[in-house]
């Protein structure tokens, strides 16, 4: 008999929650668990209820590995909104229906407010009253902003009579907790996802190939580009901007613009890719946002699931563009102000959102003055100029988004405008050539024509299974070779 050596410490790691190492798609433990998950998933392909139950339980396990026992919040939101939607559907009275949807808003936003905004609001109130506030020790569950908004979209749609409520609590739990998008989006609409739940499991060759391509693309953007430039350059600049020249600070800002894009879009790519392997379709969440020639276009390309959610459930509820131009501009600013607050309970996020809201309003005013129609594209040098201006405005806003301390942001801007010495760039390039090479690669890939990406995707789809496996192994090997520390958590986990 051969001795069996079991590493029980590693086995314990699989079943326990470690707040210092939440489970993420790019971690080794997830890749191994997902492989085992797929075996069971395929075996249950013709047993609809068993398959839905299995995925739901795995999703709760996945959330437990991200936030520990706070998975009970997910259950509270699920049960409350499922029951409230049922009551709304059976209720005819306007005010009764209004009361039920208000209760749903209260449950979801109440949980969000307590866990995310208690200390922020307490500090603001204490400051206004001239007192002091001692911050409470409140844990922020991962992804609470995402699953509360996702569940709210369901109850609001039922209230508006745009969809009928589900009759199965299990199906609704599956929708709210579906692990590929649970902790960092994209925010999936009920009307798009729920009809897919009970469909026969079918993964075409194209779906499988595209899923693999998106997983590889997301892993490359996250683990190769984002993590490397963050650890080796961006973090150093943002932590101590006064120690670096204006050129270094500007390159740090460009680096962060690429880092946050590769980090968040990389997660979205992996989420969409994993969903495709499971037979589900998600809508696009990023569409080359830095190619935008206006701030309005940027928000049609950046975090599309959130921007469309804010438009449909907040901006339109405030009146949208139905109550005159001034009210429309104010609604844009309010929507983006609250959108900034959604990202975090801190003034830097509020400022970031307000900047974008004012810019959106100013762009609307400019469109009115010039007589340009909604959605009308600019071409040639005008579009190039628009892309440059929009990109640098977005970068300016990223400075305040990244820096929790306002003075740090002002120091960084001061360095850029007062100590900008381009003659230092060759020396900087010599010291950080790997970082700048990855930044150049990242921006080239971002600005490449969509047809190039589609061609590569088609190539992956046509590869035999063995070829896809070789690609996956090669990328994982590259990640291991370039890793100089533990893989960094996704930036949007904190939201």
Name the predicted role of every residue range.
Residues 2-494:
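Membrane-embedded transmembrane alpha-helical bundles that form the catalytic cores
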């Amino acid at each position: 008999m051969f001795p069996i050596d079991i590493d029980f410490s590693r086995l314990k790691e699989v079943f326990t929650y470690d707040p210092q190492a939440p489970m993420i798609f790019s971690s080794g433990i997830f890749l191994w668990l997902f492989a085992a998950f797929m075996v069971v998933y395929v075996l249950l392909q013709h047993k609809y209820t068993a398959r839905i139950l299995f995925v739901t339980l795995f999703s709760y396990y996945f959330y437990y590995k991200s936030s520990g026992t706070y998975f009970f919040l997910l259950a509270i939101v699920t049960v409350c909104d499922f029951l409230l939607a049922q009551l709304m559907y059976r209720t005819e009275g306007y005010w009764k229906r209004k009361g039920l949807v208000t209760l749903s808003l209260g449950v979801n936003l109440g949980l969000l407010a307590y866990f995310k905004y208690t200390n922020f609001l307490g500090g603001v109130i204490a400051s206004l009253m001239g007192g002091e506030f001692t911050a409470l020790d409140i844990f922020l569950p991962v992804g609470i902003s995402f699953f509360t908004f996702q569940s709210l979209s369901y109850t609001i749609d039922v209230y508006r009579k745009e969809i009928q409520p589900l009759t199965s609590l299990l199906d609704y739990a599956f929708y709210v907790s579906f692990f590929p998008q649970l902790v960092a989006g994209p925010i999936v609409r009920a009307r798009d996802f729920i009809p897919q739940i009970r469909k026969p499991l079918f993964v075409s060759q194209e779906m499988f190939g595209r899923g693999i391509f998106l997983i590889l693309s997301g892993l490359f953007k996250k683990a190769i580009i984002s993590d490397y430039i963050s650890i080796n350059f961006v973090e150093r600049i943002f932590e101590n901007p006064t120690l670096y020249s204006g050129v270094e600070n500007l390159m740090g800002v460009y680096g962060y613009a690429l880092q946050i894009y590769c980090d968040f879009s990389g997660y979205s790519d992996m989420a969409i890719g994993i969903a495709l392997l499971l037979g589900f379709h998600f809508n696009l969440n990023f569409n080359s946002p830095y190619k935008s020639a206006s701030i309005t276009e940027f928000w049609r390309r950046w975090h599309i699931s959130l921007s469309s959610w804010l438009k449909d459930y907040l901006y339109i509820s405030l009146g949208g563009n139905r109550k005159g131009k001034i009210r429309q501009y104010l609604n844009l600013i309010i929507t983006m102000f609250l959108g900034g607050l959604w990202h975090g309970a801190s003034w830097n996020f509020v400022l970031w959102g307000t900047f974008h809201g004012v810019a959106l309003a100013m762009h609307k005013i400019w469109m009115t003055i010039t007589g340009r129609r909604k959605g009308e594209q600019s071409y040639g040098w005008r579009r190039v100029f628009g892309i440059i201006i929009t990109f640098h405005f977005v970068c300016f806003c990223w400075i305040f988004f990244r820096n929790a301390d306002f003075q740090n942001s002002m120091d960084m801007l001061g360095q850029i405008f007062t100590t900008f010495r381009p003659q230092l760039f060759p020396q900087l390039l010599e010291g950080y050539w790997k970082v700048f090479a990855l930044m150049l690669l990242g921006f080239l890939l971002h600005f490449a024509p969509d047809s190039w990406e589609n061609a590569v995707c088609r190539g992956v789809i046509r590869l035999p299974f063995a070829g896809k496996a070789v690609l996956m192994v090669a990328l994982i090997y590259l990640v291991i070779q370039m890793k100089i520390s533990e893989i960094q958590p996704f930036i949007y986990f904190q939201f």
